[in-house]
């Protein structure tokens, strides 16, 4: 766990993601036609992006689904009430030097909290977390999915648009000459 926590601290965090379902309204912006959440919450699903972190998570994971394993990495996230997109259970782990708070709440009144231990949850039930105090809070959420990440879908749409525009430009040039 110590290595994993150290890697989470050293990680380059990007305050930009597509998880608008858990972001506060003031953290959501429109970038072109896409809603973007200005929160530290990033998907890690390919080992080659961050191999050392990926391997450290895998080494302590309570369950692993090979190519269907997905990881959400969060830093100081105060998630709004939401449901997760995956079907089935997820696992969550909290790390960091925060001193208190940050519990995960469910509509049925259940509340879980505690550092450095995995909790099995059903993300299909509405849930949110409390603010934490004193320091930085990291969370790792493991879940199973065979869906392509939203970023892949967006990148494919961008590529199709660029290709369409190129075809249209070439057509206009052909017609002019």
Q: Which role fits each region the language model picked out?
A:
Residues 1-118, 124-177:
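Fe(II)/2-oxoglutarate oxygenase catalytic core
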